[in-house]
Regions:
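Alpha-helical bundle segments that constitute or directly flank the non-heme di-iron/ferroxidase center
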Residues: 14-45, 68-79, 153-156
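Short linear motifs at secondary-structure transitions and domain/linker junctions
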Residues: 24, 31, 64, 88-90, ...
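Acidic/histidine-rich alpha-helical segments that form the ligand environment
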Residues: 28-39, 97-134, 154
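Short, contiguous alpha-helical
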Residues: 2-13, 49-93, 122, 134-174
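Acidic/His metal-coordination segments adjacent to aromatic residues that form catalytic metal sites
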Residues: 17-21, 56-59, 96-110, 141-149
Length: 174
């Protein structure tokens, strides 16, 4: 089977066959939490809460934003796979940051939530058939989105925000 790779789930000895392109995307998706964890490593609570760049979120706020959107995207992907063209609601990151106690949250809890959500979703994604990645949902703002598009978007979400964390670290000289 050219262009395909067998993937063995370590906790389930059943061999799943996933297209290589999807497996590579799933691997990138799984790598995100480690990248995020490394980007905040060694930061004190004060540094996590600091806003060294005017008008920008603190590092903790960035991590909380990422943690809030992981279950949202997981739900969207599950609904696209399980339901027929489900409605996918948009979120409001600024409203979440304002109302969801970002300054009181614990960075380790947020990182753990991201890691566990992605591990669970990767297990589900690896069980899918190639055609399942073309299933669609209807986003309230963006219109029709495939499961593949949702996976690509959430996979790129952490790397996108790591740039801002690195910018804050430079501004704090850490």
């Amino acid at each position: 089977m050219a262009g395909r790779k067998e993937v063995q789930d370590q906790t389930n000895p059943t061999v799943r066959t996933v297209p290589m392109s999807y497996e590579a995307l799933i691997e990138q998706y799984l790598a995100g939490p480690g990248l995020l964890r490394r980007s905040v490593a060694g930061m004190t609570r004060g540094q996590l809460l600091a806003r060294p760049i005017a008008g920008k979120w603190s590092t903790l706020e960035v991590v909380c934003h990422l943690a809030d959107y992981e279950p949202i995207y997981a739900d969207r992907m599950k609904r696209v796979f399980a339901l027929k063209e489900p409605e996918l609601l948009k979120g409001d990151p600024a409203l979440f940051a304002e109302r969801l106690a970002y300054d009181r949250r614990d960075v380790e809890e947020e990182l753990a939530l991201i890691e566990l959500t992605r591990k669970q979703m990767a297990r589900i994604l690896r069980a899918l058939k190639p055609e399942d990645f073309q299933r669609k949902g209807s986003h309230s703002r963006d219109g029709a989105l495939t499961l593949k598009t949702l996976l690509q978007r959430i996979t790129g979400h952490i790397p996108h925000h790591i740039r801002f964390i690195e910018e804050k670290r430079r501004a704090l000289s850490i």
